[in-house]
């Protein structure tokens, strides 16, 4: 329960929590099996109208280092990834007003024509923005992207699924219900996704537990989340700044997430 989660986070012994989480993992994957994916994150543009306070990545359209990736650069990055054994691409970027759905359909088709690789790409905020500037609804947008080669959605753009937090750190980004609805719609058309969380900006424990509750509830409804991935907020070079949350706090929350999200098969470590 939420109350048990809060109590154990505040008072539980970290090693005991870790052992309990490992036991939960072993029930799913006995014989000490752990899984991993080799993929590459490719950013197609750093031009973004969202301008989140925690972000050090975005640029304005006329900044000297603003870009939209060209296909030669894209294919070179994919070639490097394939040579290293990658089986998946995570293609993400800013909310660029010049990139309608046609850009992404062409991008995904060109990749699928050349490579036998999973396209795990576009976060919920990107999907909503693409739909908006292309005059489409969410379902039609996802169906068209799926037909073009999009296999699954990453969980980025969730940060913390509590609008009290979101209004402060990303006031121009979609709200909690919009993020959940994109995922629900993706699952309804047979497109799997992951769920994520960025902890440690201005959020508190009750915000994070609320976030997990929303994820678990949607998973009960659709069964469409393949994995949950969490990472810590990285202060510096952004408007929000602040302090970095401790590694022990991360491990404590990670262990409890394995116990709480009993309906999601994989808890994944972040590369970033």
PLM region spans:
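Canonical Radical SAM [4Fe-4S] cluster-binding loop centered on the CxxxCxxC motif
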Residues: 34-73
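Conserved alpha-helical substructure of the radical SAM core
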Residues: 59-93, 113
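Conserved short loop/turn motifs at secondary-structure junctions
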Residues: 6-8, 38-41, 93-97, 199-202, ...
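Short, acidic/polar
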Residues: 71-78, 136-144, 212
């Amino acid at each position: 329960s939420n109350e048990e989660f809060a109590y154990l986070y505040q008072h539980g012994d970290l090693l005991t929590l870790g052992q309990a989480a490992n036991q939960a993992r072993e029930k799913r994957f006995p014989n000490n099996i752990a899984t991993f994916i080799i993929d590459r994150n490719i950013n197609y543009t750093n031009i973004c109208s969202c301008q989140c306070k925690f972000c050090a990545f975005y640029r304005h359209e006329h900044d000297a280092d603003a870009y939209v990736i060209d296909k030669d650069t894209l294919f070179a990055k994919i070639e490097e990834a394939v040579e290293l054994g990658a089986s998946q691409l995570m293609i993400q970027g800013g909310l660029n007003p010049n990139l309608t759905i046609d850009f992404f359909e062409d991008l995904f088709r060109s990749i699928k024509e050349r490579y036998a690789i999973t396209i795990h790409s576009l976060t919920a905020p990107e999907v909503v923005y693409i739909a908006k500037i292309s005059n489409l609804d969410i379902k039609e947008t996802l169906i068209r992207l799926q037909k073009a080669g999009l296999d699954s959605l990453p969980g980025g753009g969730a940060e913390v699924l509590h609008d009290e937090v979101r209004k402060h750190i990303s006031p121009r980004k979609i709200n909690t219900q919009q993020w959940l609805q994109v995922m629900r719609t993706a699952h309804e058309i047979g497109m799997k996704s992951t769920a994520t969380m960025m902890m440690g900006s201005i959020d508190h424990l009750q915000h994070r537990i609320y976030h997990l509750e929303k994820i678990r509830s949607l998973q009960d409804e659709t069964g469409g989340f393949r994995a949950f991935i969490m990472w810590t907020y990285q202060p510096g070079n952004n408007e929000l700044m602040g302090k970095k949350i401790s590694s022990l706090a991360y491990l404590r929350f990670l262990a409890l997430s394995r116990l709480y999200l009993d309906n999601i098969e994989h808890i994944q470590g972040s590369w970033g």
